[in-house]
Each structure stands twice: as structure tokens, then as C-alpha cells.
Amino acid sequence: IRVFSVMPTLNDNGVHVGGIVGFLKSIGFAINMFNPTRVIIVFDGKGGSNRRRKLYSDYKNKRRTSYRVNRVAGLENVEDERRNMYLQLRRVAEYLELLPVTNISVDGIEADDAIAYIAKSVIPDGEKVIMSTDKDFLQLVSDDIKVWSPTKKKLYDKEAVLEEYCVTAENFIMAKIFEGDKSDNIDGVKGIAT
């Protein structure tokens, strides 16, 4: 939950619920903005990154921080903060069960892979909007798939990808291969991505 670090909201009992509030607000905003006929929310499955870590042991290795991302009273250290975030994620999943949305998590599969599969294969027809701050999804942009970045408040279609990144959506993954991906701890091609 990225909103965990920017929404230090406490409930009446002093329990940190910023991630829950921020997540549900962003989903509500997207529903109001795009008026979809169906909403699918996808989470990483248990052990979702294991397959990639077997191929490359440093995959996403830099993501575990040793510093505090949120300074909420009552959370004394990074482990308290992580535990609180996971509790909020569990509550978000419980709340989603009460809403008219499809909630998906498949053990051994990262959310990114499930989202790509759903957008391209499970729901092949009609316009789809992927809501994410992860630019990796820009490789999926096509005539019927767009990406909404809630942090940039921008909808990426093929033209927007080309305009911002000077590469077509179809070639976005190739550019990422050359550049590398710091968020996943993957180096680029030496001599090109220096």
C-alpha cells in the first residue's frame, strides 16, 4: 500500500488506518472517473516473487527498507510499521469482499503477471483501464488497454506513452531491458544504461 506512507490517518481508537482509507478512496475515485462495468482488484499471491528470485536472487532485494516510511505515533520501528501495513492489507481484502468487485490473488503469481494475463487474455474485448503507479504496465498499453497513474493523475494511451517516454508502448519493455529497473534491482545493459 503506497498510501500507507502518505496517509497517517488514525481511527477513533488510535489505530493507524491510513492505508485502508487511502486505498478505498483511490478505488472510489477511479470508479467515479471511469464508470466501469466491472472492477477487478489484484494482489500478489503468497510467494509471488519466488519464481523470479530463483532466476535472480537479488530481484526486488532493495525494496525492504530499514528506515521508517511513516511516523505514526505508536509505531516504534520498521517491524511495527510492516506488521501494521500487513494488518491493513488484510482488512482491505476483507472490505473488498463486501463490495461489488472481483478480488484476485493467486499463490505463486505476482499481481503484475495476473493483471497482464487478465487484461490481454481473460477479457480480450472492450476497453480496459489498469490503475497503477507501476510504469511496467505501460508495455501493455494498446488500442483497448490504458493505464491510469493515480500519482501523476494521468491516463496513458499509446500517444501518451510515446510522448512521455519517446518509445512506443510495444517497445516499452525493450527500453526497460536496456535501462534496467532500479525498483526491481535489475541492472541495465552495460554501455547503454550508464
What do these predicted regions represent?
Residues K154-S183:
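A short, charged helix-loop
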Residues I1-M131, F137-L155:
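Noncatalytic, basic helical substrate-engagement surface that gates or grips nucleic-acid strands
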Residues N35, V39, E127, E170-I173, ...:
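Residue-level signal for secondary-structure boundary elements
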Residues E179-T194:
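Helix-hairpin-helix
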Residues S132-T133, I192:
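A conserved hydrophobic position in a structured secondary element of the catalytic/binding core
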